[in-house]
Curated annotation (Swiss-Prot):
Keywords: Activator, Developmental protein, Differentiation, DNA-binding, Nucleus, Phosphoprotein, Transcription, Transcription regulation
Subcellular location: Nucleus
Protein name from the UniProt record: Transcription factor 15
Region (Disordered): 26-65
Length: 195
């Protein structure tokens, strides 16, 4: 006698009255899939496994097609809200990052990379203080300028950022641009007491 190993066919294809599986149920491992009953051989399933934990067929929640549709619609609405929230946050972040040209539309990955670089740049500006009057603290601190500027407290500045590198490639300085990146958004640099 020959036996064939058959994989379960989706319930929604064979039986329209069986509820659709949620994402969690669809993502279960194949061993868990063997525990599911798709409407055929229900009596055989319970006698073979017997009652008890993990045995027998799963109790149906009594969810009809209308309930499943409502649950799916609610999940879709939550996902739309989440996506809208993420997009709003990216829009807010884009307004804080100086770009050239000013109206340049950044992708999400460009926004994250530029934000990271801008944070590093601002950290170097804070670390170096007044020592970087040319508007390129990261470039000078990395040794790319005429003299490397050490941090006031001996810490090493971070590597050159996109903003200082762009400024250096243009051959410009702080005075040529009419102010540092801090002044692009109307933020004045912090000036602490000189040591």
């Amino acid at each position: 006698m020959a036996f064939a190993l058959l994989r379960p066919v989706g319930a929604h294809v064979l039986y329209s009255d069986v509820r659709l599986l949620s994402e969690d149920e669809e993502n279960r491992s194949e061993s868990d899939a063997s525990d599911q009953s798709f409407g055929c051989c229900e009596g055989l399933e319970t006698t073979r496994r017997g009652p008890g934990p993990g045995g027998g067929r799963r109790a149906s929640s009594g969810a009809g097609p209308v309930v499943v549709v409502r649950q799916r619609q609610a999940a879709n609405a939550r996902e739309r809200d989440r996506t809208q929230s993420v997009n709003t946050a990216f829009t807010a972040l884009r307004t804080l990052i100086p770009t050239e040209p000013v109206d340049r539309k950044l992708s999400k990955i460009e926004t994250l990379r530029l934000a990271s670089s801008y944070i590093a740049h601002l950290a170097n500006v804070l670390m170096l203080g007044d020592a970087a009057d040319d508007g390129q603290p990261c470039f000078r601190a990395a040794g790319g300028g005429k003299s490397a500027v050490p941090a006031a407290d001996g810490r090493q500045p971070r590597s050159i950022c996109t903003f200082c590198l762009s400024n250096q490639r243009k051959g410009g300085s702080r005075r040529d641009l009419g102010g540092s990146c801090l002044k692009v958004r109307g933020v004045a640099p912090l000036r602490g007491p000189r040591r």
